[in-house]
Amino acid sequence: EPRAEDGHAHDYVNEAADASGHPRYQEGQLCENCAFWGEAVQDGWGRCTHPDFDEVLVKAEGWCSVYAPAS
C-alpha cells in the first residue's frame, strides 16, 4: 500500500513536529491518537479512516489539520 507524502491532504506531515507552525497543531497530537486512526499495519504506519486518506497509509507520528482527539 502506498504511504502518504507530506502535503497529501489537509496539510499532512509524516512528522508531527513539522506542523509546529500550523495554527491548528498542538503538541502531542499524532495520527496514532486521532479519532481517524484505524489500525497499525507495519513499521509505524497505519490506516486512517478519513476518506481523503483511504488509499494511503499514514505514519503513526504524523499529523494533519483534521486531527480529532480519540475518545
From Swiss-Prot:
Region Disordered, residue ranges: 1-21
Residues holding [4Fe-4S] cluster: 31, 34, 48, 64
Keywords (A to Z) from UniProt: 4Fe-4S, Electron transport, Iron, Iron-sulfur, Metal-binding, Transport
Keyword Ribonucleoprotein annotated: no
Listed Gene3D superfamilies: High potential iron-sulphur protein (4.10.490.10)
Residues passing through the membrane, by range: none
General remark: In E.halophila, two HiPIP isozymes are found.
SUBUNIT field: Homodimer.
UniProt record similarity statement: Belongs to the high-potential iron-sulfur protein (HiPIP) family.
Protein name: High-potential iron-sulfur protein isozyme 1
Species for this entry: Halorhodospira halophila (Ectothiorhodospira halophila)
